[in-house]
Amino acid sequence: MAGGEAGVTLGQPHLSRQDLATLDVTKLTPLSHEVISRQATINIGTIGHVAHGKSTVVKAISGVHTVRFKNELERNITIKLGYANAKIYKLDDPSCPRPECYRSCGSSTPDEFPTDIPGTKGNFKLVRHVSFVDCPGHDILMATMLNGAAVMDAALLLIAGNESCPQPQTSEHLAAIEIMKLKHILILQNKIDLVKESQAKEQYEQILAFVQGTVAEGAPIIPISAQLKYNIEVVCEYIVKKIPVPPRDFTSEPRLIVIRSFDVNKPGCEVDDLKGGVAGGSILKGVLKVGQEIEVRPGIVSKDSEGKLMCKPIFSKIVSLFAEHNDLQYAAPGGLIGVGTKIDPTLCRADRMVGQVLGAVGALPEIFTELEISYFLLRRLLGVRTEGDKKAAKVQKLSKNEVLMVNIGSLSTGGRVSAVKADLGKIVLTNPVCTEVGEKIALSRRVEKHWRLIGWGQIRRGVTIKPTVDDD
């Protein structure tokens, strides 16, 4: 990235310039042109029964395959969330009928381009830049959403038109949305090309009946075919009109939860050419800037001679920021942001930094080794296919000394229940975590060889450890 040092983005001349010298954080909004030209500011989760076409819809809107990783199944449920960004445009010719005047493209598309619709004039202009968070499974989606590893502003609920509604998992997804208190939902009736019109109408009635009395009541139901890209422009229009622009905090000290990290150096690279590690995540609040000094907590975790946990935060500097292929000078909340640092690349290799929190030096929360939580358990297990009409298994109460998986932010760690009474519990964590009182956590238990979400909790207080810092 030549010339980026001076605080001005020079890459991609077709996108809006970002200049650190003239940046006034107090004037930024999630629709500021110089922000949405290069990065997404609204996060939309995609939810739906397996094989109902979530990734296909995301691909139809954004042109991006949210790639899946082979090792995903092997490692507990460390999830790779698939993120895909899309720009949504509106044609500035008032004579063009809706929904044809809406269009979506990938995130590196210019902010304006001439119309190609016969009989219209003018340009398509950028109105929104959204990020789709595509989760493989719903208990994972819930854990992710519950933890707040990504701020979710809205959800697309996918229902396949060629199956009856509701499928067993679909009702759980609604439960997930209820727990998450997501207000803004669009229901997409997918695979409409595979059914007769009468069947589609019948299913539409089923969907209406199904969402009655839930958070999704009154949500628009849009018939689409993701494969044939049919009605995708209607989805774009509804995203613009029905999903309000979320209030965002640009002025606090920045904080980013790391959900991916990697070493971008090729093997055999000359020492002088080595690049620092890259961390990827969604900014929760504040604005990160190129050149800024940062701290990563808990940092490097080790044990002292007595077996006590020690944490040594990592201090570094941001050398580059990017969203998908777009260079940034500063990054705001929303979408997945890559942060190029001067951290030793071996510390970032193969997702080693996942679960850490990155932010301004001295402004990050405490590091906890034990948590006291107030918790809620689900009445029944989610996501377990039951035979016939049998109800899903009941969730048993927490018992002392059992080991649960605790998801805090993007960190999945083991936790031993050391005490439990009524709706309060104490958990001793296997790995220290940087978090604060009031944060939500998700609890999972091993049921028939799988981790299953059994409930969620909120941190009341805990045991913290002081980070060790070198004297130099």
From Swiss-Prot:
Spans annotated as G3:
134-137
Query: Which positions fall inside the tr-type G domain?
Result: 39-248
GO molecular-function terms, A-Z: GTP binding; GTPase activity; methionyl-initiator methionine tRNA binding; translation factor activity, RNA binding; translation initiation factor activity
Q: What is its main location?
A: cytoplasm
Reactions mediated catalytically: GTP + H2O = GDP + phosphate + H(+)
Q: Where in the cell is it found?
A: Cytoplasm, Cytosol
N-acetylalanine modification sites are A2
Q: In which tissues is it expressed?
A: Widely expressed.
Q: Which GO terms describe its cellular component?
A: cytoplasm; cytosol; eukaryotic translation initiation factor 2 complex; synapse
Residues reported in the UniProt entry to bind GTP: A51, H52, G53, K54, S55, T56, N190, K191, I192, D193, S225, A226, Q227
UniProt modified residues of type Phosphoserine: S16
Residue span of region G4:
190-193
The UniProt keyword set, sorted, is: Acetylation, Cytoplasm, GTP-binding, Hydrolase, Initiation factor, Nucleotide-binding, Phosphoprotein, Protein biosynthesis
The protein's role, per its UniProt record = Member of the eIF2 complex that functions in the early steps of protein synthesis by forming a ternary complex with GTP and initiator tRNA. This complex binds to a 40S ribosomal subunit, followed by mRNA binding to form the 43S pre-initiation complex (43S PIC). Junction of the 60S ribosomal subunit to form the 80S initiation complex is preceded by hydrolysis of the GTP bound to eIF2 and release of an eIF2-GDP binary complex. In order for eIF2 to recycle and catalyze another round of initiation, the GDP bound to eIF2 must exchange with GTP by way of a reaction catalyzed by eIF-2B.
Q: Quaternary structure? A: Eukaryotic translation initiation factor 2 eIF2 is a heterotrimeric complex composed of an alpha (EIF2S1), a beta (EIF2S2) and a gamma (EIF2S3) chain. eIF2 is member of the 43S pre-initiation complex (43S PIC). Interacts (via C-terminus) with CDC123; the interaction is direct.
Q: What else is known?
A: Has a homolog on chromosome X (Eif2s3x).
Q: What protein name applies here?
A: Eukaryotic translation initiation factor 2 subunit 3, X-linked
User: To which species is this protein native?
Assistant: Rattus norvegicus (Rat)
